[in-house]
């Protein structure tokens, strides 16, 4: 259970983390007198997130993003879920989630060509369209 406990609130928690990440990183300079918890509360309130579902990581120990490697990129987790959900939908649309033709097309157009062209172009070659949030919302039961 550990990691997945409370999964029902996971999208909200992940959203709050990415908003905090982005809002901290767009500051031109961090004021010396910045009250970190007040800043955090304002960021979340401005996005309509309620205090009853706190961020997964509080700003005072959010080393995952501030420790290097994720600089203003925590949103990539949600983007990966968008791509995953939309690609999975290609299989669902055939009526067979193990559809060999779709799997081969994904391998040929995305995996085998990784790094050879822009990622979005490769994805569109596979899917025939850019990914949207509809499949993600459907997977989460929010459609």
Report each predicted region and the residues it spans.
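Non-catalytic terminal accessory segments
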Residues: 20, 27, 32, 36-42, ...
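Secondary-structure transition/capping motifs at alpha-helix termini
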Residues: 30-31, 46-51, 90-98, 143
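C-terminal amphipathic alpha-helical interaction region
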Residues: 96-143
